[in-house]
Amino acid sequence: MENLILPKQYKSELNLHDTQLAIKTVKDFFQALLAQRLHLTRVSAPLFVDPATGLNDNLNGYERPVTFGIKEQDDKNAEVVHSLAKWKRYALKKYGFQVGEGIYTDMNAIRRDESTDNIHSIFVDQWDWEKIIHKEDRNLDYLKETVRTVYKCLRKTEQYMAIQYDYIDLILPKEIFFITSQELEDLFPDNTPKEREYYITKAKGAVCIMQIGDTLESGEPHDGRAPDYDDWALNADILVYYPVLDIALELSSMGIRVDKTALISQLDKAGCPERKDLPFQKSIIDGTLPYTIGGGIGQSRICMFFLRKAHIGEVQSSLWPEETIAACDSVICFFFRRLLKLNTI
């Protein structure tokens, strides 16, 4: 609630019915284009996993997964996924995909410890994708090439939506700007990571921040990253400036995945070297899993961005604090109030 933004004179251009149609338009166009450009095949994915496998995403290391016991299996624990970052790499091998081929899936997750605001919800929906690469592709040039491909899909989607809806103006720049987290800290040494993201994104329009997770010269990382999927030297976030809320909006987090050397190093840095003995992590060390690149792209985030919405609750159904509902009820338009209240009826 403390980070809730109530933009002045905000008015949703679409009612509830038309918003649902527009959401489908965004999702259908973008995912088809992404699959074509990255050579991805859609697959089904799990909602929950066995915690003993090490397949769940540990995010920043402190978020609690939703856990439940399975009656038929003597109350054996299962965890609702935080993301499918690790599962996808395992699936590529299991399903027999080859170099240059990949998968994408609709990922639904519950993040119970999320602090909600205009762009954060306890319900997370994203396209999770993963692609097999050659070992020699594990470099910044290949990462940048893939980022440019994803960004072109975002620009094409904005252009398509601007044709469908006359209130949508084109705001994404032609090219995305690349910068490492250390270079960004050097530019704004006296600011927080979030402030740095805001300043660079407002200046450039669309930014790819690379090399996130390791400690910077200041002694702090730009942001937290789990140590066992992204290689911290070869990952990236795609952010765009969003004028509706005057913020830097992250649309995608992606990266080239860890090899044996990066995994062992990052587990040691994160203070959890024992995780190398879990089945997933062990398969990386043993070299039985393919080299991959992958990421997640927020479905509600891009719908919110392309439809110029002020709150993620306008494009997804979730649960919100009562004070959030009350604050929006008196400031933001009627449609927004109704949608936030759907789950209280």
Where in this protein do the model-derived segments appear?
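A generic secondary-structure signal for well-formed alpha-helical elements
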Residues: 34-41, 150-161, 310
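A translation/RNA-centric and nucleic-acid-associated enzymatic feature enriched
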Residues: 110, 180-345
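Class II aminoacyl-tRNA synthetase-like tRNA-binding/catalytic domains
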Residues: 2-120, 128-132
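Extended, charged alpha-beta segments that form solvent-exposed binding/catalytic grooves
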Residues: 105-193
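N-terminal pre-domains immediately preceding structured catalytic cores
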Residues: 52-57, 61, 171-179, 321
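Generic recognition of stable, solvent-exposed alpha-helical segments in well-folded globular domains
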Residues: 21, 25, 29, 138-145, ...
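A general structural signal for short secondary-structure junctions and capping/turn motifs
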Residues: 68-71, 93-98, 119-121, 169, ...
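Generic structural hydrophobic/aromatic packing signal, biased to beta-strands
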Residues: 24-26, 30-34, 68, 80, ...
